[in-house]
C-alpha cells in the first residue's frame, strides 16, 4: 500500500531505504530556481549516507542537465548521478536505429543530443522509418 507522506515528510521513512530516485522538475527546482526545502532534504539524505539518483524527462544529455543544475547553484555532491530521458533515448536509438531515417518533431534546441543521427534526418515525414518527438504540443499536433 502506498503511504502518503505529505503530513509526516520523507524523514519518517528515510531510515528504511538506501536508494532514492528523485525527480528534478517540480521537485528539486521549478526551472528557474531551486526549492530550498528540497535541497535541505537532499542534504539530510546524504548525511544519512543514502544514495541519490536524480531523474528528468529532459531531451538533453546527462552532462547538460548537470551543468544546468550547477548554474542554478546546486552543489555537485547532489547531482553526481543524473539520468535524462534524452540520454536514455540516445542510447536506445544508437543500439537499434543508427542507420534508419527519421523525421524530427520538436524545436531545434532539442536536436543537439541527436547530432550523430543528423545524416539520417529527412524532411518528408512519409519517408521516415520513425518519428523522433522531443516535443508534442499544440504547435506540433
Predicted regions: what is each one?
Residues 1-138:
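HAD-like aspartate-dependent phosphatase fold
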Amino acid at each position: 500500500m502506498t503511504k502518503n507522506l505529505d503530513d509526516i515528510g520523507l524523514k519518517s521513512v528515510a531510515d528504511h531505504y538506501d536508494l532514492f530516485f528523485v525527480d528534478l522538475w517540480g521537485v528539486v527546482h521549478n526551472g528557474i530556481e531551486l526549492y530550498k526545502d528540497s535541497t535541505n532534504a537532499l542534504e539530510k539524505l546524504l548525511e544519512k549516507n543514502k544514495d541519490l539518483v536524480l531523474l528528468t524527462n529532459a531531451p538533453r544529455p546527462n552532462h547538460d542537465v548537470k551543468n544546468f543544475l550547477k548554474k542554478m547553484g546546486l552543489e555537485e555532491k547532489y547531482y553526481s548521478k543524473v539520468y535524462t530521458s534524452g540520454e536514455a533515448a540516445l542510447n536506445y536509438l544508437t543500439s537499434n536505429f543508427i542507420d534508419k531515417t527519421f523525421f524530427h518533431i520538436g524545436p531545434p534546441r532539442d536536436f543537439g543530443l541527436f547530432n550523430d543521427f543528423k545524416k539520417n534526418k529527412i524532411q518528408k515525414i512519409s519517408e521516415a522509418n520513425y518519428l523522433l518527438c522531443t516535443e508534442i504540443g499544440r504547435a506540433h499536433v
